[in-house]
């Protein structure tokens, strides 16, 4: 099955007190986005799209030039992760499954991305999660009785019970093409991220 990768790099990095977007902060001498794109390239996607904020196109383009052909898409307004993915939809090749990841996860490895790529051929959505001792600041994973992921609840939207959940969203999700547009159509302005 063909697949596309969407790398979200429109985050402003305000918590880092920097004018540079979060994905362009440096780690081991290279922007985090560069580390991510290097690993993405190893998975041999049919297409790679980087979503950026309008004011940072040139900065993102400079980082992306070292990778294979990459399409750049601007998220016109900072309306969160779901909206950033929505911005990429018109550019995506039809029929491709989609792997979405954040541009600020420099420790991700191609092996993990390949497992998600292969796994989404058998299911509609795969969410890469992890458990943290202190999950403050992260979206929590809500599961049903059969252990299926039912929702990702952002920290700012968590009630007291949900704040006790220590399984969090890594920001890396694989979708079958048939379901991503349907899911994004249900995204409303009330979603903070």
Where does each model-flagged region fall?
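Conserved N-terminal catalytic core of the sugar/cofactor nucleotidyltransferase
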Residues: 31-118
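Structural beta-sheet core signal
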Residues: 5-7, 49-50, 99-100, 125-128
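Conserved donor-nucleotide/metal-binding helix-loop-beta segment in metal-dependent transferases, i.e.
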Residues: 111-136
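Short aromatic/basic micro-patch
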Residues: 26, 107, 174
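Catalytic-core segments of class I nucleotidyltransferases/pyrophosphorylases
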Residues: 149-193
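Short catalytic helix/loop segments, enriched in acidic residues and glycine
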Residues: 19-37
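Short acidic-glycine loop/turn motifs at beta-strand connectors
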Residues: 142-148
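N-terminal nucleotide-binding beta1-loop-alpha1 segment
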Residues: 1-18
């Amino acid at each position: 099955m063909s697949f596309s990768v969407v790398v979200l790099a429109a985050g402003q990095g305000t918590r880092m007190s920097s004018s540079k977007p979060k994905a362009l902060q440096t780690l081991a001498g290279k922007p985090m986005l560069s580390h991510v794109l290097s690993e993405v390239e190893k998975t041999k996607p049919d297409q790679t799209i980087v979503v950026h904020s309008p004011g940072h196109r040139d900065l993102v383009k400079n980082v992306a030039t070292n990778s294979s052909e990459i399409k750049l898409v601007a998220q016109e307004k900072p309306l969160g992760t779901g909206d950033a993915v929505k911005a990429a939809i018109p550019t995506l090749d039809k029929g491709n499954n989609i792997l979405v990841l954040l541009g600020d996860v420099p420790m991700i490895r191609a092996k993990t991305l390949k497992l998600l790529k292969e796994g989404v051929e058998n299911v509609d959505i795969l969410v890469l999660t992890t458990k943290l001792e202190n999950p403050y600041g992260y979206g929590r994973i809500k599961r049903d009785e059969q252990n299926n992921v039912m929702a990702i609840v952002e920290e700012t939207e968590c009630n007291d019970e949900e704040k006790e959940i220590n399984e969090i969203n890594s920001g890396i999700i694989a979708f079958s093409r048939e379901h991503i547009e349907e899911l994004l159509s249900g995204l409303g302005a009330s979603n903070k991220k």
